[in-house]
Amino acid sequence: KIPYEREEQDFLKYRTSADQNFEDWRRSNVDVMIKNIHNELKKSFSKTGKKVLFGISPFAIYRTNTKVREDGWDKGSFNAAGALQCYSELYSDVYKWMKEGWIDYVVPQVYFPFERADVTYHDLTKWWSNLAKETNTILYIGQALYQMGSNEVWQNPKEMENQLKFNCQFDQISGTIFFTYKDLVPGQNPIKDEGLKTIKALWVK
C-alpha cells in the first residue's frame, strides 16, 4: 500500500494521532498544500490587486456511490464498482476543496465516451454539474479529444460534438477544455479529423 520506505517512515513520524490511518494522512497533506496555495494567492491579490484563479483538474470519478461500492459515498456517482476513485486511490478530496472555497474552478477529466457502459460521459457530467452548483464552484468539463479514433469505443466522429451539445443543457457548465492542444491539429486519424470538422461547424454557428 505504501510504495516507498521513506513515505512509511514519514507517515509514522508526522501523523497527527496514533489512530490516523495512512489514507487520511495523505489526504490531509494534499489538503494542506491546496489550502496554502489558496491562501498565498489571496495574499498576493491583497498586495497587488491582481487576481489569479486557482483551479484543479481531477480524475472524473471523485467517489463511487455506496449503492455500488461499500467504501463509496452516499452522494457519489454511479459507475463500475472497480473504477478508480479520486478520493481513495489518489488521496484527493476535491469535494472538500470546492466546499471550503479553496479552488475557484474545477475541470473534471471526463475522458469517457457515451458508448462506454461502465463509466459514461453523461452520468459523470451531470454529477459534476450538481456538485458545482452545491458548492458554488466554476465548472469546466475536461474532454478527451486525444482519444478520438484510438479504440473501439471512440469510433464515433460526432462524439465531441455530442458531448458539447450535452454540456449546453447545464447552466452550471461554464465551458470546456480539450485534452490536448496538439489534438486540434488535423491529420492524425480519420475519425479525429471528421470530429474536428463537426466541432468547428458547431462553434462557428
Kindly give the residue locations of the regions a language model identified:
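Substrate-binding cleft of secreted/luminal carbohydrate-active enzymes
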Residues: C86, Y91-A117, E134-K205
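Detector for Asparagine
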Residues: N21, N29, N36-N39, N65, ...
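P-loop/Walker A phosphate-binding loop and immediately adjacent motor/lid segment at beta-alpha junctions
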Residues: R26-F59, A117-G149, D193, T198-K205
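Polysaccharide-binding and catalytic clefts of secreted carbohydrate-active enzymes
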Residues: K1-W102, Y111
